[in-house]
Amino acid sequence: MTFTASSSSCAITESPVVVALDYHERDKALAFVDKIDPRDCRLKVGKEMFTLFGPQLVRDLQQRGFDVFLDLKFHDIPNTTARAVAAAADLGVWMVNVHASGGARMMAAARDALAPFSKDAPLLIAVTVLTSMETSDLHDLGVTLSPAEHAERLARLTQQCGLDGVVCSAQEAVRFKQAFGAAFKLVTPGIRPAGSEAGDQRRIMTPEQALSAGVDYMVIGRPVTQSVDPAQTLKDINASLKREA
């Protein structure tokens, strides 16, 4: 079934699920999207797809009624990052992110760049520690903290800079909700329904566990995109989350 919208305005969804689109071909991506309902999820577009297909892909998804998380993890000097974030807002995305390790001045500049957009501004989220990273990876970079400790330090800086939330692992969610409050949004990759393979994520949880931990938005990729019936898979995930709630 194909779901279309008459304009670029996005459908309202209460689902916390964000489906990660990872396709090498635009037609295959849109064929998948046309099988699912924008009431059941939002969509994430990352570096590879945006580099291949550009802003028009985002517009194509919006025209089908979907909110789009533009996952480009901007990390540059403050002025360049601010301009990039403003460009994302001009595109009408629902969420955009930056690397918290870019520092306070960079994050503050990104935040200020969204002020002219007022209520139409996207959520501005910072990446703390990539979910693929382990303690040994941080040590290689000269960081002596554990991934959890380093993520909390960066999350605290993010909140101090006035951003909307962070990308973090589900294991950090309980502590972060307690430390930073319910309004501080937690976006978590590495979410996989029971029985799914871990893939290249090292710190993973099921959707039900993530919801219980305090995750606001959960990114799920291949368990949905490679499903024989992605629409039903999404409905099953959302039903399980409603039972958990």
UniProtKB/Swiss-Prot annotation:
Lineage of the species this protein comes from: Bacteria, Pseudomonadati, Pseudomonadota, Gammaproteobacteria, Enterobacterales
Natural source organism: Salmonella typhimurium (strain LT2 / SGSC1412 / ATCC 700720)
Record key words, sorted: Decarboxylase, Lyase, Pyrimidine biosynthesis
Binding site for substrate: 22, 44, 71-80, 131, 192, 201, 221-222
Protein name: Orotidine 5'-phosphate decarboxylase
Active site location: 73
GO biological process: 'de novo' pyrimidine nucleobase biosynthetic process; 'de novo' UMP biosynthetic process
Signal peptide: none
Metabolic or biological pathway, per its Swiss-Prot or TrEMBL entry: Pyrimidine metabolism; UMP biosynthesis via de novo pathway; UMP from orotate: step 2/2
Family: Belongs to the OMP decarboxylase family. Type 1 subfamily.
Gene name tied to this protein: pyrF
Superkingdom: Bacteria
GO cellular component, one term: cytosol
